[in-house]
Structures are given as C-alpha cells and as structure tokens.
Amino acid sequence: MKVLAALALSALALAKPTPPMPGMSLIQTGPQETRWVTDAEKLELTMNNVGFFDITDMPVTASSVTKPKSYAFPGNVSHQADVKPLLGKLSSDHLMSNLQKFSDFPNRYYQADTGVQSAEWVLSQVQGVIGKIQGAKAEKIEHKWKQPSIRAIIPGKSEKIVVVGAHQDSINGQNPKAAAPGADDNGSGSMTILEALTALVSDQKIAGGQATNTIEFHWYAGEEAGLLGSQAVFQQYKQAGKEVVAMLNQDMTGYGKTMGIITDNSDSALTTFTKMILDTYTTAKYADSECGYACSDHASANKAGYPSAFVYEAVLGQDNPAIHSPDDTIDKLDPAKMLEHAKLVVGFAYELAFANL
C-alpha cells in the first residue's frame, strides 16, 4: 500500500497543470511566482520588458531552480598565442553581410513559417562553417512549436561542455505577424557568435578535437515567447545528466558604448572570468548591470543548474530603444561594437575549451 501511495503521489507531482481556458500559457515571473496568461498578455509583458519563463510545456521540474555547480575557472589567460591570431580572422564586413541576410526575413517569429526558414538559413551557414570538421555536427533541435533551435557541436577530449548561445527569433511587440527585422534583437547576437565560430574552428587544435572540453554553439528558438528554446535545451541536458561547465549568452551586441555585465541570474565566478577575457582580448568598456528575472537565455542555463554569464550591448537603459518593432534595422548598429563581442566569444570559448574544470 505504501508503494502504491508513493506512486500516486509521484504521478500527481509529475502531472501537467491544466489551463483555466484553452490556449493560455503558464508563465513564471519570479522564483515562486506563476500564473496563467493569454497570448495578448504575454505580448504585453514583452513590450513592457518584463522577463518570464513560459513553462507550459516544460517538465514540472523546470519551475524550480537547481543550484549551479561550482567550478574553479582560470584566474589567468593561458592561450594568447593561439587566440590573438584568431581575432585577426574576424571580419565586420562578413558579419554585417550575414546580418543583412538574416534581418531581411520579414520576421523570425517562432510560430511563423519565416521563423522556420530563418532557422534553416542559420543551419545552412553553420553547416558551411563546420561541415568538413571530423566529428563535428550541425543539427536542428525540434520543438513543439514551429521554429527549431540550431546546435553546432565541436567535440573535445571530454564530455564536459562549454556553450555559447544566442536566440535567433524576433518579434513585433504590436503584432507577432507584422514586420520584425530584429537586426539588433537578436540578429546581432546570432551573427556575432556565427562569426566567432568561423574564426574559432580555423584553429587546428580545435578542429582536430584536441581541446580538453567539447564546445557547443546554440541558436535558440522562441526566446521572445518566454525563453522557450533555451529552456527546452537545458532542461533536456539536465535530465540527460550532461555536464555544462559554462554558458555565455549573447543577446544584442550592436548598440551602445559601454557593455553591460549582467550580474543577476548568472554565475559570479564565471562572470569574473568573463571580465578577464574582456580585459585581455577586447578594447571594450563595460559596467555591471542587472536585467531582471528571466530576461534572456542565460537564465535558462542558470535555472537548470549550469553556470552562465551574459554580456549585453549596454547597461540597461542605454540599450537599443527600437527593439520589438519594424525599426530594429541594421543601419542603427555599430559593426565595430559587434566585433568586440565576437572577440569576447572567441577568447571565452578557446580559454575554457582547454581549461581543466
């Protein structure tokens, strides 16, 4: 009887909640704050810059936070001789050419056909970058919604994983079906990490699988609808027992003068390491900032128990005012600023790829 009772309680705990009305979503706006909302209410939250997790279709465990494991990240850089030549291979012209193509999609909404097409385009670019590397993979991660996430895997000697991520979707806050070029949010971050990946895999040791750790680059679907893609990925990793030792988020890289180092819902030790990378490999100015609960995809990694860091384009309040509108266009962005973010990504990924963690 005790066994049956335990099984019944277990089943109850794992049962998915039922919406009060069809089509509503269960969102989380704080560690202990959940509520059901309509699509219109979700859109209003997005327009008001209120971060939230949409946990409607996530595992029940996704509503709770797993404390990230502590790692002793390097206190010094060790690979300047390898990294600095890679930085010289970064091209702002190439980055901006890719961004122009990416922002030419009418929108990249996660439930739109054009959101699927833009994801397929990202996949084709990634395949072109890593397709000839033995053991490397470029693949789609299918979800319950239309747009897939995209993942690049460059294997190392261990199964410990260093992740660099950016969300690929865009949204028009007034009407999800309307124009949303999303050049800055988040075409800039998506193409920044693509440019960094291109430089990174030109290194023979990285491409030859000689790195200590495996490197993954992610382009997440559905961030604007409640961090959907990144939640799905990191919750799946958590359930599979994968060890992600670090995650760097790049959400908006093209605007502002001083980068914002996000200190909430992130790992303090990894953030300190990230500042060291900025000081060593970039000329960027930066300052600490906060973006609130569930503001971007690093929060999904943090929630799943993985150390994460987020370097934003600016301190909050000095960022691009044109996001979530038809006016988020490429002409407002600074190619040199985006290149500094790409340098950060290359340095971060390379140093941690060879770190003993």
Curated annotation (Swiss-Prot):
Pfam families (alphabetical): Peptidase_M28
Origin: domain of life: Eukaryota
Membrane-spanning residues: none
Subcellular location: Secreted
Presence of keyword Calcium: no
One record GO biological process: proteolysis
GO molecular function: aminopeptidase activity; metal ion binding; metalloexopeptidase activity
One cellular-component annotation, GO: extracellular region
Enzyme class name: hydrolase
Essential cofactor(s): Zn(2+)
Disulfide bridges in this chain: 291-295
Residues the entry annotates as binding Zn(2+) 1: 167, 185, 251
Assembly mode: Monomer.
Role played: Probable extracellular aminopeptidase which contributes to pathogenicity.
The family this protein is said to belong to: Belongs to the peptidase M28 family. M28E subfamily.
Protein name as it appears in the record: Probable leucine aminopeptidase MCYG_04170
Source organism of this protein record: Arthroderma otae (strain ATCC MYA-4605 / CBS 113480) (Microsporum canis)
Origin organism lineage: Eukaryota, Fungi, Dikarya, Ascomycota, Pezizomycotina
